[in-house]
Curated annotation (Swiss-Prot):
Cell wall biogenesis/degradation in keyword set: no
Gene: mscL
Protein's recorded name: Large-conductance mechanosensitive channel
GO MF, one example: mechanosensitive monoatomic ion channel activity
Family that this chain belongs to: Belongs to the MscL family.
NCBIfam families found in the cross-reference section: mscL (TIGR00220), PRK00567.1-3 (NF001842)
UniProt key word RNA-binding: no
Pfam family, one: MscL
Organism of this sequence: Leuconostoc citreum (strain KM20)
Subcellular location: Cell membrane
Gene3D superfamilies: Large-conductance mechanosensitive channel, MscL, domain 1
Known role: Channel that opens in response to stretch forces in the membrane lipid bilayer. May participate in the regulation of osmotic pressure changes within the cell.
């Protein structure tokens, strides 16, 4: 049972997933820092409000408060993360397309050898 577990863990997909989760966790911290320390102050500068985007809110009554700043912060984090993932996927797809094109290109030597084979077969028949 232990050897089966080891085989399962050492499979490429599981290792790739583990690396992705670890890098994703680290990347989340970077995106949050970018949003909180760079983007939020810029937005705050233009809105003239609180120094933290998280604290933006709309108070309707004492009991009813809409904390739209926290939502905006999460939307910004999502958009940054989604954009970076998009760029990463686009980059990987470009690499895969380039590799496929290289595989598809026929070797000129093989074409010449095929022509020679065809000529030899034609001579045998004649």
């Amino acid at each position: 049972m232990l050897s089966e577990f080891k085989t399962f863990i050492m499979r490429g997909n599981v290792l790739d997933l583990a690396v992705g989760v670890i890098i994703g966790g680290a990347f989340t911290g970077i995106v949050k820092s970018l949003t909180n320390n760079l983007i939020s102050p810029i937005i705050t500068f233009f809105t003239g409000g609180t120094s933290d985007l998280q604290n933006l809110k709309l108070v309707v009554t004492k009991e009813l408060t809409f904390k739209y700043g926290a939502f905006l912060n999460d939307v910004i984090n999502f958009l940054i993360t989604a954009f970076v993932v998009f760029l990463l996927v686009k980059f990987v797809n470009r690499i895969l397309r380039t590799n496929k094109k290289e595989e598809v290109k026929a070797n000129p030597e093989l074409e010449v050898l095929a022509e020679i084979r065809d000529l030899l077969e034609a001579q045998k028949k004649a």
